[in-house]
Amino acid sequence: MKRIFLTFIALVFVVHSAFAQATPKPVKDLKPTVILISLDGFKPEYLEKYPAPTLSMLAKEGVRAKWMTPSYPSLTFPNHYAIATGLYPDHNGIVANNIYAPEFNETFSMSKREEVGNGRWWLGEPIWVTAEKQGQRSAPLFFPGSEAEIAGKRPSFWKVFNDDFPNFERIDMALSWLDLPKTERPTMITLYFSDVDHGGHDAGPDSEDVKQAIARVDQSLRRLVEGLKARAIFDRVNLIIVSDHGMARVDPRNVVVLDDYYDANQAQQIGWNIAWNSSMVHIFPKPGMEDTIYASLKKAPHVTVYRKKEIPARFHYGTSNRIGEIVVMAEEGWSINSRDRVRPPQLLPDGSVKYRGAHGFDNQLESMRALFVAHGPAFKRAAVVEPFANVDVYNVMAKILKLKPAPNDGNKATVKALLR
């Protein structure tokens, strides 16, 4: 009996010790700090449509934009890197999710891990490189570009992207960085969550999948807020919560098959390089074939076909050598594909077609609008501001961190609109 009692006391001591070790200490000597959080595919209207108590609290107490305008094309990699650098995709090198680069005759895609980590693709200067160059430490977690050495610099902390890495563990990793000694602690941290984007793609923006995904990411935000409060720094850390783009409802039967608009027997003769992105396509014709291909594709419905030099200025798109000489843009709700890539639509139990979601369309469309919410000592409180372009966020972060910004495309008026 005595042995059982002593064992019990020892167990209580171990549990108490573990709890004590797990209880964070207040963080002291905190420098101006930014945590940039990306909720991929989160439409601003979701805040009113679906329950998200933590995000709603941050938006109510802090500052939010009516919406943030993504850069064209409204795809994941181009827009994350536009936010990070303040440069439009036309200037930052990441002109799409799938890219053909004539300068080294190579292709890039999100799934080509070796290329994702190769700095030759990533132009400009992301905020974490700006911080490292000026003596601050950075920790971009799963943010596009963070795996590469850019301008001779790497972040102090980074991790190879793993979409299966649990959301709560991402939060805990960020909090652990804040627990580091002052000399080791990063001032620029990023987090990335793909749940809402996956839900939107799988079932469309008006779906139970999206509702559940928002609940999950909001729980993660709650864990972050509670972790900051436990360290007595919730009101001392600047949180910036953004999305890269919105989401449009798509009928999977709405496909423009490019093969139908040129002579397949001439395919080898034409020999074009194509960078496929579903909602838009870059075509690099062989010399002398541009007019033929352009004339053929102009016959296709539900797309707009531009010569590179004729892309409207409002897109800020058309000077990079990684943009095709011909660019085909899909109408909202349509996709572009080749015959060998088209798959039959998924059917629901009642036999009807399952609608899905897509993005990458005209960045001025309401369905493509992105989220911006910020909370912290640098930001205005209980404010709603007019829409602005996502390339403006870089200057906002640089101002908070007291960094000299690299050359960028952002409008500094947004800094004044958001900050105290």
Where are these regions (language model features)?
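Active-site nucleophile/metal-coordination loop of metallo-enzymes that catalyze phosphate/sulfate
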Residues: 22-31, 44-133, 149
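Metal-dependent active-site segment of extracytoplasmic phospho-/sulfohydrolases and closely related
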Residues: 36, 54, 216-259
